Amino acid sequence: MNAPAKFSTSQIRSDFLAFFEGKGHTIVPSAPLVPGNDPTLLFTNSGMVQFKDVFLGAEKRSYVRAADVQRCLRAGGKHNDLDSVGYTARHHTFFEMLGNWSFGDYFKKDAIAWAWELLTQVWKLPADRLLVTVYHTDEEAFELWRDMIGIPESRIVRIGDNKGAPYASDNFWQMADTGPCGPCTEIFFDHGDHIAGGPPGSPDEDGDRFIEIWNLVFMQFDRQPDGTLVALPAPCVDTGMGLERLAAILQHVHTNYEIDVFQALIGKASALTGIADLENKSLRVIADHIRACSFLIVDGVLPSNEGRGYVLRRIIRRALRHGWMLGVRQLFFSKMVPTLVELMGEAYPELVVAQETVARALLAEEERFAETLDAGMKIFDDVASRSQEIIPGADAFRLYDTYGFPVDLTADIARERGMRVDMEGFEFAMERQRETARAAGKFGGGVALPADLVATMAPTVFLGYEAQDADALKVVALLKQGRPVDRAEAGDEVIVFTDRTPFYAESGGQVGDSGQLSGTDVSIEVADTQKFAGQFHGHVGRIAEGALKLGDVLSGGIDVQRRGKTILNHSATHLLHAALREVLGTHVQQKGSLVAPDRLRFDFSHFQPITAEELAVIERKVNAEVRTNHSVEVHNMAMQEALDFGAMALFGEKYGERVRVLKMGGYSTELCGGTHVSRTGDIGLFKITSEGGVSSGVRRIEAVTGQGALDYVAEEERRLGEAANLLGGNSTEIVDKVRALTDRQKRLERELESLKAKLASGATADLGASAVDVAGVKVIAVRLEGFDAKALREAMDRLKQQLGDSVIVLAGAAGGKVALVAGVNGSPTGKVKAGELLGHIASQIGGKGGGRPDLAQGGGEDGPALATALQGVPSWVKQHLG
């Protein structure tokens, strides 16, 4: 039997797309690893994710046939292969899925015929090495394989409901308990009888002899709530074929880690770590994880302590720990990126564009974890040595909280040693910390609308895009002290819900409007407007006069000046976001914001501090767009239309079928439901007031606009002038004068240190003569005015050299505080411990301290007790010398 032809991974990709393009398919780019509009899914884990809305009928595409190579990730959440990666032949965090799709066009006959043609005629796989499965009642697929393709019945396996329920089968696909579903047929490659394992459906099907290549799903039914299947009017086809396992077959190797892409990455990891054994499992882990980490960063995810960013952090740290296991103590992981770009950059140009960003983000995380990895491993070793089979949950939490060890990393290490982590104990410790954080963060009780009340209300109609005041606002709900009421009176604190309102409810970072509601004989001062249940605007305020009841009709007007200042800041955040992405890179994503009348705050993903030069460029770019005075356009459109329009959606946000797109010239296009200026020039001036870190991988910029920015600049100029006056010059001379002042200060500090050293030298010479002899040991316990801890240590060293066998206590007093140093030199060290002596003294002056047997440090309060404590030192020493 002739061996099949050999194909590179790159050629397999291009062959697949070219083949289906020739069959009339539109070639669709891979979707990002972060699903664009599915908050229920952590990562894109299959080819069908980007077409989900098409299959559900919620979206129409311009084509009915499609083919793609989809990058996928399975790590975290329901689909998690992380623990198996590196230890099995075919598990990966990142993988590529080849797929062809029919949306109500061709069906089983063409799907089966084309799959067979590609496998046997293009890639030359021997037909007698292929086996197929079908759902046990799918006679159409069975007959197509037997009669059209010519596969013997002995190599067509019927698979029934093998998962304990009707239609619960390896060969029946369903998106959920109801909705589109249908049978599938799978194609397997037979590695030969020299490999252990049986065919699918047999007791030993989990062996490695028969490997699934391709799954063809035929969506032909709509499953009803009662479990019955109704035929779909336009059946669809969804196929998926794992590139890595197909490449293993076409390259004549048995594991995915032996294919060309992985061999190149493993080779690079080998060179960086100095490990020559290319089958080493840790090298496999590193090779797998560099792909997952790099493409996550390409798709806008950065390491953090929550959500997708935390999954990325876990994968990076797992790779770093495997490097540590190999004895690597230098930074290495980010150096894998150029090799990955060489291998996959042609297929994914976005990887080439983001290469520098990927390398910098990985390096920053590598440097961060390197600081705690060694210490954390020592803690783990200590815990493991004291435990039999279980790592206590409290210790696993300490490794997570203090040393940055994700719990699955700790579990990974434990498993290698035949141990396990007490996950219940870990979750208990984690929840206890969450409760502490929640308690610390509480500033007032939350109020929710009762479900029965929500059921009777229609979503509030927001009028505030066009109007600042409105009449005929009907009161549809009224809360007092968090409970629904029919009536409230003057002095009552209330939340008023009307059917319509010009008041913006806090969302998207923009604060809620304040203002006034009024009606016949009633006036309500609105301090804030909040959104309840995502769709009801609640006016939070106090009834100033009169009484209010359900059904009343009100007029309302917002605080126009407050709203005016707020919209300047909101529009500026959009320009700032665009400028950050232009200057720092497209990895920048909004992570949070506050848009208030007096300032704006913008949190974003970035892995290192922003330099002063970068900050200046960002500010200049925003102000340039302000001066350009672009018209601000608002468009309402379907979600997909908005994305095609170039609108930026925020990762993790859930959007409706129709969205509001805000466009500022050609500079910024984002989805946004907030209120904004008409032209960018309305912002006037944009001024950054601060920049700093919020958490790992998240930075924060605060800024002011309009009159607030002018006021800020004026205050800065006033302070500059005041500083110039203090320095005896004008503002243009400040830098030179401050530099001269700093140089003078440094010179004086050096002179002061020199004088202190001379003083200490002279003082120690005099002190030596005052030593008390206690059983042949010289004892000194004195107070030294103006001596800090450093000067005390220097004096201690001189006295030890001068006195020989000695016990010395020095107290430096300054500003009501006392620094203490105790030393034991020579023969007394066996009986007198410096740490115990210092603790004895410190306890008498309201302080504490400790240290080694020969040297200890501490401190306390200055006062009469110090003299008494020092006077008692000779007696204490005598007692301990025996």
Curated annotation (Swiss-Prot):
Any GO BP: negative regulation of DNA-templated transcription
Cofactor: Zn(2+)
InterPro entries: aa-tRNA-synth_II/BPL/LPL, Ala-tRNA-lgiase_IIc, Ala-tRNA-ligase_IIc_anticod-bd, Ala-tRNA-synth_IIc_core, Ala-tRNA-synth_IIc_N, Ala-tRNA_ligase, Ala_tRNA_ligase_euk/bac, DHHA1_dom
Record's GO cellular component terms: cytosol
Note accompanying the cofactor annotation: Binds 1 zinc ion per subunit.
Cystine pairs: none
Superkingdom classification of source: Bacteria
Binding-site residues, Zn(2+): H570, H574, C672, H676
PROSITE patterns: AA_TRNA_LIGASE_II_ALA (PS50860)
Keywords tagged on the record: Aminoacyl-tRNA synthetase, ATP-binding, Cytoplasm, Ligase, Metal-binding, Nucleotide-binding, Protein biosynthesis, RNA-binding, tRNA-binding, Zinc
Localization per record: Cytoplasm
Reaction(s) this enzyme catalyzes, per UniProt: tRNA(Ala) + L-alanine + ATP = L-alanyl-tRNA(Ala) + AMP + diphosphate
Domain notes per entry: Consists of three domains; the N-terminal catalytic domain, the editing domain and the C-terminal C-Ala domain. The editing domain removes incorrectly charged amino acids, while the C-Ala domain, along with tRNA(Ala), serves as a bridge to cooperatively bring together the editing and aminoacylation centers thus stimulating deacylation of misacylated tRNAs.
Summary of the function given for this chain in its UniProt record: Catalyzes the attachment of alanine to tRNA(Ala) in a two-step reaction: alanine is first activated by ATP to form Ala-AMP and then transferred to the acceptor end of tRNA(Ala). Also edits incorrectly charged Ser-tRNA(Ala) and Gly-tRNA(Ala) via its editing domain.
HAMAP family associated with the record: Ala_tRNA_synth_B (MF_00036_B)
Similarity annotation: Belongs to the class-II aminoacyl-tRNA synthetase family.
Protein name: Alanine--tRNA ligase
Organism: Xanthomonas campestris pv. campestris (strain ATCC 33913 / DSM 3586 / NCPPB 528 / LMG 568 / P 25)
Recorded name of the encoding gene: alaS
